[in-house]
Amino acid sequence: MSAIVDIFAREILDSRGNPTVECDVLLESGVMGRAAVPSGASTGQKEALELRDGDKSRYSGKGVLKAVEHVNNQIAQALIGIDANEQSYIDQIMIELDGTENKGNLGANATLAVSMAVARAAAEDSGLPLYRYLGGAGPMSLPVPMMNVINGGEHANNSLNIQEFMIMPVGAKSFREALRCGAEIFHALKKLCDSKGFPTTVGDEGGFAPNLNSHKEALQLMVEATEAAGYKAGEDVLFALDCASSEFYKDGKYHLEAEGRSYTNAEFAEYLESLVNEFPIISIEDGMDENDWEGWKLLTEKLGGKVQLVGDDLFVTNPKILAEGIEKGVANALLVKVNQIGTLSETLKAVDLAKRNRYASVMSHRSGETEDSTIADLAVATNCMQIKTGSLSRSDRMAKYNQLLRIEEELAEAADYPGKAAFYQLGK
């Protein structure tokens, strides 16, 4: 009864008004699974290919009708009749059908839409919530959220090069408390921006995008907002950065417009260390360019024992590239973005590889999102203990937070909120 009888994709819009792929998978039992694919703004060079039409007369070339056609034709023909519980087998069929390293023929947006919709259909058919279907019956942790309250870089139109300034409510006793803490700080920050004459418009991920003079000024604003909301920075709340360094790395230097200077990789590592020494920063994502492995090694040697160093553009959720990073001893955490690799099975393989080598994993959204909340279930299913899914505004971000509230409610006494223990690779 769990055999796939129909697969149908359509073109929908994401949170930036750009087209993306949504897929419905129908089973013999009458159950349907639906999933929609996210899209990134700052993307790693080695990410799986997001297939766009290139027809400038539609959506400025960003249409996804080709990817939709691939789902409705080649992929559907290959998968109809197969048991939806055979997730790995289904994903492998799509990988082989595509035949490239980067999903360049079918498009990762096509394969991922099907992969996630199959999992949702199979979970529904099994009578299980998605997080239980994927994660099994063992104990589960709710993730500590990284909440993006100040946006810069590719996510905002201001002079800040560092892309995301985030708060992490590590002192909370539950996810519900953590969410309240983040929301209260977010609203305190809005009042603070208002009082200083900064605009309170928000960026792609829901954070504020004030035109500040330096990155330190952004961090100081976060300290003030945390205290104004009644919490202690460094105790109740820790900070996290996503530098997205590849976006300002050029000709062997890191160019910070807000600071008015350029840095070698050694100098930039020292700059980041100075921020860590001055502010309660526990996590830095993409602190070096994705191809600057020497810089990554320097940064890991300098900060890897006390700060979580997350590889996003560096690893692109690819088990092969992650294995290389582990061997070279760079970074100590993996950012997990399902559309960087293009199937659920490969995503889970990357998380498992990270875990076995004492690298933390951070489940992540993209800047172009939909109401799909699959990553909330994935964060719990994998027990990765951290999630990055934007600020405390925009419905596309709230969909994930609200789903985590529901999951915590369902788990009841069995729900664990790890707090600082989420940084187990640091011995926290």
Swiss-Prot record:
> Where primarily located?
cytoplasm
Annotated residues for binding of (2R)-2-phosphoglycerate? 163, 337, 366-367, 388
**Alphabetized UniProt keyword annotations:** Cytoplasm, Glycolysis, Lyase, Magnesium, Metal-binding, Secreted
- What name is this protein filed under? Enolase
| Presence of the UniProt keyword Heme in the record | no
Kindly state what the record says about how the cofactor is bound: Binds a second Mg(2+) ion via substrate during catalysis.
Catalyzed reactions per annotation: (2R)-2-phosphoglycerate = phosphoenolpyruvate + H2O
- The keyword Oxidoreductase belongs to this UniProt entry's keyword annotation: no
Task: Name the active site residues.
Answer: 205 (proton donor), 337 (proton acceptor)
Localisation: Cytoplasm; Secreted; Cell surface
EC number(s) recorded for this UniProt protein: 4.2.1.11
Could you say which enzyme class this protein belongs to? lyase
Describe the task this protein carries out: Catalyzes the reversible conversion of 2-phosphoglycerate (2-PG) into phosphoenolpyruvate (PEP). It is essential for the degradation of carbohydrates via glycolysis.
In the record, biological process GO terms are: glycolytic process
Query: Which CDD domains does this UniProt record tie to the protein?
Result: enolase
**What gene does this protein come from?**
eno
Q: Name one GO cellular component term.
A: phosphopyruvate hydratase complex
Among Pfam families, the record links this protein to: Enolase_C, Enolase_N
Matching entries from PANTHER family are given as: ENOLASE
